Design a protein with these regions (language model features):
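Conserved SGNH/GDSL esterase-like catalytic core that processes O-acyl groups on lipids
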Residues: 89-173
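Active-site flanking residues adjacent to catalytic metal/cofactor-binding acidic residues
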Residues: 105-107, 193, 231
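A short helix->loop->beta-strand "cap" motif at the edges of active sites that frequently abuts
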Residues: 185-189
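Hydrophobic positions in alpha-helices of CheY-like receiver
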Residues: 177-181, 223
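N-terminal secretory targeting modules
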Residues: 1-99, 270-276
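Alpha/beta-hydrolase-fold catalytic nucleophile elbow
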Residues: 153, 193-194
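Charged helix-capping and loop-helix junction motifs
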Residues: 167-177, 209-215
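Catalytic His-Asp segment of secreted/periplasmic serine-dependent ester chemistry enzymes
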Residues: 198-276
């Protein structure tokens, strides 16, 4: 039998055409959805809808497009935040290695950051009995330090001391102190930590500590409304209740890496509900 001569160039040309057609079909089927920012179906449908409205009401469409862009950025932040949090909470990344040029203000609970040797004592402006009304006393010191990050870790004494009748009054005053800090240190990132709850037998000392969850709800809303970063630490109580001291108020040494992880992740990337 006579062997047939194979036309290699022709075969390669056919293969190239087939591949090109497949790529074209794939692109058309995706409809150009593979932008630099990965979009949800909801955002994509919104863009298609806006295209049909743009000629009718351009100003309204312009505002909606801005909101959609912010939603896309929010999704990007969330996608970055979760892997970082996972690395920090698992111990894969040492959270304290990320603390550069900072100041921590707070009460006796915040003292633990330097007491256990995690952070510099000179940068932890905290002591037993302190409330947010101590913040103005640190204004000059903070301006001198000019830190890149400030972490506010108050709430336990604030809730029980009686200066505020409810969470609304407390949150309103808290926001004013943060705004003053922002005015004095415009390049500083400020993070408000949620109030970490107490547990038995602490309630024998103050029944008002049972109101901490309610105060947190109000404080979180106030921060969101005023563009203030809020570190929601509720998960720490749910996941690590045994890391509270026997007094039900303070924390064991092993607690601080978890708390610091949530604080620094919020400062670097934003919270689960980022400030606008």
């Amino acid at each position: 039998m006579t062997d047939k001569k194979v036309n290699v160039p022709l075969i390669l040309l056919v293969v190239a055409i087939v591949v090109a057609l497949l790529v074209l079909i794939l692109f058309l089927s995706l409809g150009g959805k593979n932008d630099d920012v990965e979009l949800t179906d909801q955002v994509w449908e919104g863009r298609e809808y806006l295209a049909s409205l743009e000629k009718k009401d351009p100003e309204t469409v312009k505002q909606i497009r801005k909101e959609l862009f912010q939603q896309e950025i929010q999704e990007q932040l969330e996608n970055e935040r979760e892997p970082l949090l996972e690395q920090l909470m698992s111990g894969e990344t040492d959270p304290f290695s990320l603390y550069k040029d900072y100041a921590i203000l707070g009460d006796s609970r915040a003292v633990g950051f330097w007491y256990w040797g995690f952070l510099e004592k000179s940068r932890c402006l905290s002591d037993g009995g302190h409330t947010i009304r101590k913040i103005p006393e640190w204004y000059d010191k903070l301006e001198e330090m000019n830190p890149s990050y400030i972490f506010l870790c108050y709430g336990l004494n604030d809730c029980s001391i009686g200066y505020w009748d409810n969470g609304e009054q407390y949150a309103a005053e808290y926001v004013e102190y943060v705004k003053e800090l922002q005015k004095r240190l415009p390049d500083c990132t400020i993070v408000v930590s949620s109030i970490l709850p107490a547990q038995d037998p602490a309630f024998e000392r103050s029944k008002r500590w049972r109101d901490i969850p309610e105060w947190n709800v109000v404080l979180k809303e106030a921060c969101a409304e005023n563009g203030i970063l809020y570190a929601d630490c509720d998960r720490l109580y749910e996941e690590y209740p045994k890391l509270w001291d026997p007094d039900g108020i303070h924390f064991r040494e092993a607690f601080y890496p978890y708390w610091s992880s949530l604080l620094i992740a919020t400062a670097l990337i934003g919270g689960q509900e980022n400030a606008g």
